């Protein structure tokens, strides 16, 4: 007698396959929803996870910045005028990068405050962080640093150096994320979209970059904003002498990295970073955290620490240094009236 068997018709096979796909979909959807629910219920944040997330956000935003520049679809517009009267530009690169960065962070940790230079009216993206922590972070940063969400403020700059971005001066362009705890900069990430170079620092834990071996404060190289280079020249020369080399550059992130020993061969280097006019906190917080993680300083021109809670602006100018007597530098600076505006 021949063995009994089960034969499925083509219709039966199709129904069976559809049922299988349905089961897989519901299982996957359940994993995603449970992951989102986990983060929404959590009222504390692990800072090592937030560092890894910040790097991912900066890189994802950077991809948008690079793609739009390469496609030449900038859609350049103006927000208005800066306090100095210059046109404050924004592009599709700024907006798309903002969406990627802002919603990745907010979807992962909805209870933390996120301040961004840009504001998009479009619907948020359903982006979920993979929770993958890079090996270099696992090696250098210990876990378990849980901080109440209400103590945290995240500052993001989706595209630093927009003016230079529109001029195709791409070495100055960065995306940045900074994490402040009770107003103090703790984590900083600066990513260069056009070279793929990323720098991070975690105060008290370490960084993936190092300072240089020495810095010259007798006849220093001073990096300043290229849009204010003429205005700040006399200020710098009064402090450090007429032969002081002044390096005009775009982007606050780029200028902060100039004080370090980066492996990016397109990065200029300087001994001191000075800014004399009003500047937004999303421009400087990441650089401040990275410098502090390596023993450096970023203060107002009067030597005051910058509070990264509250209002978005810093009116006191900026002095940044590494491995030198920062207080002695402050004493050499002349009075600058514009920083009171």
Curated annotation (Swiss-Prot):
Pfam families tied to this protein: Inositol_P (PF00459)
Cofactor(s), names only, from the UniProt record: Mg(2+)
One function term, GO molecular function aspect: 3'-nucleotidase activity
Residues engaged in binding Mg(2+) 1: 117, 157, 159
Xref: InterPro entries: CysQ/Inositol_MonoPase, Inositol_monophosphatase-like, Inositol_monophosphatase_CS
GO biological processes: inositol biosynthetic process; phosphatidylinositol phosphate biosynthetic process
Binding sites annotated in the UniProt record for Mg(2+) 2: 157, 160, 283
Pathway assigned in UniProt: Polyol metabolism; myo-inositol biosynthesis; myo-inositol from D-glucose 6-phosphate: step 2/2
TM stretches of this protein: 11-31
Membrane topology per record: Single-pass membrane protein
Catalytic activity: a myo-inositol phosphate + H2O = myo-inositol + phosphate
GO cellular component: endomembrane system; membrane
Similarity-based family: Belongs to the inositol monophosphatase superfamily.
PANTHER family: 3'(2'),5'-BISPHOSPHATE NUCLEOTIDASE 1, INOSITOL MONOPHOSPHATASE 3
Full protein name: Inositol monophosphatase 3
């Amino acid at each position: 007698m021949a063995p009994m068997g089960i034969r499925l018709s083509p219709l039966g096979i199709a129904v069976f396959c559809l049922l299988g796909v349905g089961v897989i979909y519901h299982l996957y959807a359940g994993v995603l929803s449970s992951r989102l629910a986990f983060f929404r219920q959590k009222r504390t944040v692990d800072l090592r996870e937030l560092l890894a997330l910040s790097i991912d956000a900066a890189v994802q935003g950077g991809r948008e910045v690079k793609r739009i520049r390469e496609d030449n679809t900038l859609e350049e517009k103006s927000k208005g005028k800066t306090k100095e009267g210059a046109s404050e530009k924004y592009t599709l690169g700024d907006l798309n990068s903002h969406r990627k960065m802002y919603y990745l962070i907010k979807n992962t940790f909805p209870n933390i405050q996120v301040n961004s230079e840009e504001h998009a009216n479009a619907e948020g993206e359903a982006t979920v962080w993979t929770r993958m922590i890079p090996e270099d972070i696992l090696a250098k940063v210990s876990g378990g640093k849980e901080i109440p969400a209400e103590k945290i403020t995240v500052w993001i700059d989706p595209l630093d150096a927009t003016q230079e971005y529109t001029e195709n001066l791409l070495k100055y362009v960065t995306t940045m994320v900074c994490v402040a705890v009770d107003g103090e900069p703790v984590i900083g990430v600066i990513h260069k979209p056009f070279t793929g170079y990323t720098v991070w620092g975690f105060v008290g834990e370490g960084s993936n970059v190092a300072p240089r071996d020495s810095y010259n404060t007798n006849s220093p190289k001073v990096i300043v904003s290229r849009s204010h280079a003429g205005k700040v020249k006399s200020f710098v020369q009064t402090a450090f002498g007429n032969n002081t080399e002044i390096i005009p550059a775009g982007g606050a992130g780029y200028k902060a990295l100039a004080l370090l020993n980066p492996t990016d061969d397109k990065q200029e280097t300087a001994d001191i970073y000075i800014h004399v006019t009003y500047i937004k906190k999303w421009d400087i917080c990441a650089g401040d955290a990275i410098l502090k993680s390596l023993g450096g300083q970023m203060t107002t021109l009067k030597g005051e620490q910058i509070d990264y809670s509250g209002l978005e602006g810093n009116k006191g100018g900026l002095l940044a240094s590494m491995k030198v007597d920062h207080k002695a530098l402050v004493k050499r600076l002349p009075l600058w009236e514009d920083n009171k505006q």
